[in-house]
Amino acid sequence: MSPLPIFHRLPHATFSSFLLSLSQAGSSKTSVAFLNAFKSEDIIARIGLWWQLIRAVVVVPVFKFLVLLCLVMSVMFFVEVMYMGIVVLYVKLFKRKPEKFYKWEAMEDDVECGSASYPMVLVQIPMYNEKEVCEQSIAAACKISWPSNRIIIQVLDDSTDPASKELVKKECDRWSKEGVNITFEIRDNRNGYKAGALREGMRHSYVKQCDYVAIFDADFQPDPDFLHRTVPFLIHNPKLALVQGRWEFVNAGQCMMTRLQEMSLSYHFTIEQQVGSSTFAFFGFNGTAGVWRISALNESGGWNDQTTVEDMDLAVRATLRGWKFLYIDDLKVKSELPCSFKALRSQQHRWTCGPANLLRKMAGQIIRSENVSLWKKWYMLYSFFFMRKIVAHILTFCFYCVILPATVLFPEVTVPKWAAFYLPSLITLLIAIGRLRSIHLLAFWVLFENAMSLLRAKALVMGLFETGRVQEWVVTEKLGDTLKTKLIPQVPNVRFRERVHLLELLVGAYLLFCGIYDIVYGKNTLYVYLLFQSVAFFVVGFGFVGKYVPASSYLA
């Protein structure tokens, strides 16, 4: 009896003609070989035949279609990057500074009114178990140059660790004794996380006397002149709702991972934020280092925790109300980059999942809005959301980490040189403009960004389809000076599960296999990229990135 009796029940005549039609482009010997393999009792031969059929009918056509799709996305992304580069070049060449387009006058004491001529400003500092950085951030906020009777420092502490909460309270009491108008606010719960804390902070009675609110995360240290540089724009330009400053990183040189993060974020601020501000007066609020007009914030519905990007959510809703934003590139606020890989992964998950989920929830409102021009809607939906928050992540992982390596295994699937090499190189060089002094790290940055693309692709799917950890909010760990002072214990025996990321290792193995296959059977030099990229995935997969901080060394 045949080991595969089901094959003998198939209509052999029909199937034979099908095989012949598939192989008609080949020789008659090939066709006969196909038929003989099908009629054979050898299970290996039949499996091989079925694979050849599936490869010819399904796999290769699918990959060819995906390559075409990726080529289209590559061109779209290149055009987007070129457009942003041209805008920034125009802004730089013609020195189109904010002061040229928005009225700005320095704040001075009125002879008759004195400090009463200054508007009331609320400074909010949300915190959660951040004892390593709370003192420096509170101190920086309390040193802001502004009349003491026209500013309120509001520390919103959601800490669950008694030691952290006590330290924050002591710091607030210390500055209060020095004459600073500072309040220490706590909640019974953490509903809404950061958005919930900010929302509760705005409900206090003393906030009603304030005109503007400046927001700084716990690791941010504004310069004393921060309000003097931002508030005048809001005073003299009633259509402005937000003035955003740029992040500057005090620990950028701490390790390779922080240097690579600095490159990405420098591009975000130098190019993306500046383009949005210069063209459509719209960009995503960065959640910190910015000043809001309180009336605009309230008119837009206040803080909403429907997504994990409450800052971007508020920016979109304010724009739909007709408000404008201003970004000041040379207004730098010191902050800290995540130096542990665990913290970076949590941050990148939130920064990718949140915008995708926000697009899902707000796209309809953007389209229907009557306060936004057609071109601005196009910019918001296409450039801001679709290209930068969706296509960029899909293209990076699917094309460069899955489809391009697969062309080694399927020679029938070809990728033009301009798409495989020239276009990505141009895009990378354009992105590198944001941080020219780090251009020598460009190759490492490309490999690291590709390795991180798997995490971002997963987060993107969660956000778009609202599944899994779509509402997960993990506060990015800040270490302040603890690494320098060695307050974090060195733990030589690290638990394996804390470091290993299985999916990254699987992708690394896939790339390694493709690279070796290309060396043995290939006719190009794609293996050079594949082998280096596989190493990057293995490094990320085994957690050999950044400063390792054991879970027991900081508070969750």
From Swiss-Prot:
Its EC number is 2.4.1.32. Keywords: Cell wall biogenesis/degradation, Glycosyltransferase, Golgi apparatus, Membrane, Transferase, Transmembrane, Transmembrane helix. The active site is at residues 158, 311. InterPro entries: Glyco_trans_2-like, Nucleotide-diphossugar_trans. Ubiquitous. Substrate binds at residues 217, 219. It is a multi-pass membrane protein. Disruption phenotype: Embryonic lethality when homozygous due to defective pollen tube growth and disruption of embryonic development. Its main location: Golgi. It catalyses: GDP-mannose + (glucomannan)n = GDP + (glucomannan)n+1. Signal peptide: none annotated. It is an enzyme of class 2 (transferase). GO terms for cellular component: Golgi membrane. GO terms for molecular function: glucomannan 4-beta-mannosyltransferase activity; mannan synthase activity. GO terms for biological process: cell wall organization; embryo development ending in seed dormancy; pollen tube growth. It is found in: Golgi apparatus membrane. PANTHER family: GLUCOMANNAN 4-BETA-MANNOSYLTRANSFERASE 7, GLUCOMANNAN 4-BETA-MANNOSYLTRANSFERASE 9. Probable mannan synthase which consists of a 4-beta-mannosyltransferase activity on mannan using GDP-mannose. The beta-1,4-mannan product is the backbone for galactomannan synthesis by galactomannan galactosyltransferase. Galactomannan is a noncellulosic polysaccharides of plant cell wall. Required for synthesis of a cell wall polysaccharide essential for pollen tube growth, for cell wall structure, or for signaling during plant embryo development. This is Glucomannan 4-beta-mannosyltransferase 7. It comes from Arabidopsis thaliana. The lineage of its organism: Eukaryota, Viridiplantae, Streptophyta, Embryophyta, Tracheophyta.
